[in-house]
């Protein structure tokens, strides 16, 4: 697959043809999407999905989705036809995939699990696009209701990640511009020099991939990401020690922290999708990419020296090139 082309061409689609999406197709998309993510991770599965494909199942899901509106003051003021229209849109959609992640016993574990399911959802969207299937990633706050949680069987220790509504598209929505990665890019301590020239890990090659990767889904086109590249000097040495990784260079992918918790969660998911795009694109490069979420990124004092701002957080540290081993580090400093 030409990942660059698919990533750039994929669109969020809200209107679908009446052609059904076969269960076998959905199963194949899920299996391949999970495999693509596992190729970069430890293979552990901390997520599950539910498929609403039959008319009865779609009606049931739609009822749970509008339950919060109907029971609210706003719902009592809205015309019945408007609520019926919202329900009809959900029931007419050929299929819905609900994704759920395990919460985890620590913030780091919860983030790792959520990042995994978001990455898999992005893979599903990209793979589906190649088959002519468009999707909409839905996380509206109207889903925050007891009726919806009962319908999807949300358990204690689980977290709702989103719904992928899907169907074959007849018309491709127009493209919406993305901000070039260069405008959200900072280099600390210089570029790669000599350390890995033979592996071609340079700021230029990383930026080329990022300018494709930024075509990730993000609500309201907030583009909540920023990139900090450490290709040499003290910053790269410090990251090698912190990560226990003899990488040629590092890319810190940072998310802006919104005050609104719902936006904050949506933005984190968007950055995870961008990172997944980057990893898929980098698979054709001569240098490997290792996606890590080490413990130190949760300590603001460790993040400050790399230029992470007060209202930002590191979503992942991407180790670029090298073999992943650092003889200067003790085993306890390695990510497990």
What are these regions (language model features)?
Residues 3-13, 25, 160-205, 314-336:
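C-terminal helix-cap and adjacent tail motif
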């Amino acid at each position: 697959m030409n990942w660059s082309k698919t990533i750039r061409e994929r669109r969020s689609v809200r209107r679908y043809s009446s052609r059904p999406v076969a269960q076998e197709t959905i199963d194949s998309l899920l299996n391949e999407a999970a495999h693509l993510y596992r190729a970069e991770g430890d293979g552990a599965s901390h997520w599950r999905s539910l498929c609403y494909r039959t008319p009865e199942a779609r009606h049931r899901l739609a009822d749970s989705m509008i339950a919060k509106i109907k029971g609210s003051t706003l719902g009592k003021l809205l015309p019945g036809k408007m609520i019926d229209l919202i329900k009809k849109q959900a029931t007419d959609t050929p299929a819905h995939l609900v994704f759920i992640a395990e919460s985890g016993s620590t913030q780091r574990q919860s983030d790792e699990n959520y990042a995994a399911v978001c990455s898999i959802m992005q893979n599903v969207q990209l793979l589906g696009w190649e088959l002519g299937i468009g999707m909409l990633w839905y996380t509206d706050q109207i889903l925050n209701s007891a009726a919806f949680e009962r319908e999807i069987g949300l358990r204690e220790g689980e977290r709702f990640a989103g719904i992928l509504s899907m169907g074959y598209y007849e018309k491709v929505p127009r493209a919406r511009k993305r901000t070039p990665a260069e405008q959200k890019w900072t280099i600390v301590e210089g570029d790669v020099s000599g350390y890995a020239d033979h592996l071609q890990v340079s700021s230029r090659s990383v930026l080329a991939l990022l300018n494709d990767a930024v075509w990730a889904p993000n609500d309201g086109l907030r583009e909540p990401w920023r990139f900090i590249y450490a290709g040499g000097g003290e910053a790269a040495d410090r990251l090698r020690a912190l990560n226990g990784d003899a990488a040629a260079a590092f890319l810190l992918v940072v998310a802006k922290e919104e005050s609104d918790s719902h936006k904050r969660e949506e933005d984190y998911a968007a950055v995870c999708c961008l990172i997944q795009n980057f990893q898929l694109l980098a698979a054709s490069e001569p240098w490997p990419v290792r996606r890590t979420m080490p413990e130190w990124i949760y300590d603001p004092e460790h993040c400050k020296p790399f230029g992470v701002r007060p209202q930002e957080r590191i979503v992942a540290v991407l180790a670029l090139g090298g073999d992943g081993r650092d003889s200067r580090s003790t085993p306890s400093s390695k990510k497990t």
